[in-house]
Regions:
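Phosphate/nucleotide-binding beta-alpha loop and adjacent structural elements of enzyme active sites
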Residues: 1-365
């Protein structure tokens, strides 16, 4: 049996590949998508020419390539680096945060640091950059490269994310996009053009997508800094919701999405279920397998898929129950689905502390 549900789906794909577009690919393609190899096709775009060269030098998959370029809504709209990566208001709010004060403290050292260290501090603007006067319009780039099918779109460029997302307006259906992952801001105004979560959410719901996961990153102010979650200055254990990661996908089982869901191929639906599993929302994947059992059954064994998803849900269990047994315990209203009432036991505190030490924000993509 495959080690994961995405690996199972990758084995069963016959005619389609898993096509991924990563806009803001510094650090590389997320390792979880490698489960689709050798049926993984990906294009990474990043403003750091230094990073794109590094990634290309390490890449062994001939179907994955990297483009060093800034992205824009128009090819004749050069990038003004002097204005900062984000809107003026966002920049002013960002400057109030403790991670920016740490950046200031380390500024001189970072100028001479390695590109890897600069990226660890999100100081990508200090690395060797692509030509800001020659940005690319991503949908046009896809056309030039012969990309007519795209499963997964990820955007994280620390600035004009919403502007770039809108360049795909009217193209999600023609490209066959099933999932979108974006960095979003929880600060800003009510203006419809700003890169904020509420504008992103409205736009993507209008394009036929629904929210399946939302990770919130809190940031403390420099007036009273909180402890950082990671070894580098970024989000903190407390503070205001500043940014986050939003995960949108096609909800093919929703009544108001039935028509669009009916246009997806069997392999697209299988890949969608694999995306849910990769996002650590295996319940959505299981619901899709059950709701589209007749459609998916010719492609792979549904019960095997459900067992893998049930095992994913029981990650802390040495011997996970099968899907059927797991559901039986739930239907029996087993105490296993609840935390005991009363004070938190000492063993649970120790277990939680140990888990928190090794996984400070577990499975965050």
């Amino acid at each position: 049996m495959p080690l994961s549900f995405p690996a199972l789906i990758a084995e069963k794909l016959k005619t389609e590949k898993f096509a991924l577009l990563d806009i803001g690919c510094s650090g590389g393609i997320d390792p979880k998508w490698r489960a689709f190899e050798p049926r993984l096709r990906a294009l990474g775009i990043d403003a750091s020419a230094t990073e794109c060269r590094r990634l290309a030098g390490l890449e062994r998959n001939p179907d994955i390539s990297y483009v060093a370029a800034f992205v824009s809504s128009a090819a004749n709209k050069p990038i003004d680096l002097s204005a900062g990566p984000a809107a003026p208001l966002i920049m002013k709010i960002r400057d109030r945060m403790s991670f920016m004060r740490t950046r200031e403290i380390r500024e001189e050292r970072l100028k001479d640091a390695s590109a890897e260290e600069q990226f660890r501090h999100n100081a990508w603007e200090l690395t060797g950059l692509a030509d800001p006067g020659k940005p690319v319009v991503v949908p046009d780039l896809l056309t030039q490269r012969g990309w007519t099918d795209l499963d997964y779109l990820k955007i994280d460029i620390d600035g004009a994310d919403f502007e770039i997302l809108q360049t795909f307006d009217g193209r999600f259906d023609t490209l066959g996009v099933i999932a979108v992952q974006l960095e979003v801001n929880f600060v800003g105004t009510e203006q419809p053009h700003e890169h904020t979560f509420h504008n992103t959410d409205r736009f993507l719901r209008g394009a036929g997508f629904d929210l399946f996961r939302l990770d919130v990153r809190n940031c403390s102010t420099r007036a009273l800094p909180a402890r950082y979650i990671w070894p580098t200055p970024a989000e903190t254990v407390s503070g205001r919701p500043f940014q986050g990661e939003a995960y949108y996908a096609r909800d093919v089982l929703a009544p108001h999405r039935a028509e669009a869901g009916g246009r997806l191929s069997t392999e697209k639906i299988a890949k969608l279920a694999a995306v849910f599993s990769a996002w650590d929302v295996p319940d959505a994947a299981a619901e899709l397998l059950i709701g589209r059992r007749e459609t998916l059954a010719p492609l792979f064994d549904i019960d095997t898929g459900l067992d893998l998803l049930a095992a994913q849900t029981q990650a802390n269990r040495r011997r996970p129950l099968s899907y059927r047994a797991y559901m039986a315990t739930f239907e029996a209203d087993s105490p296993e689905f609840y935390r005991p009432e009363g004070p938190v036991p000492t063993w649970e505190r120790i277990k939680s502390a140990w888990r928190g030490y090794w996984h400070p924000r577990e499975k965050r993509p």
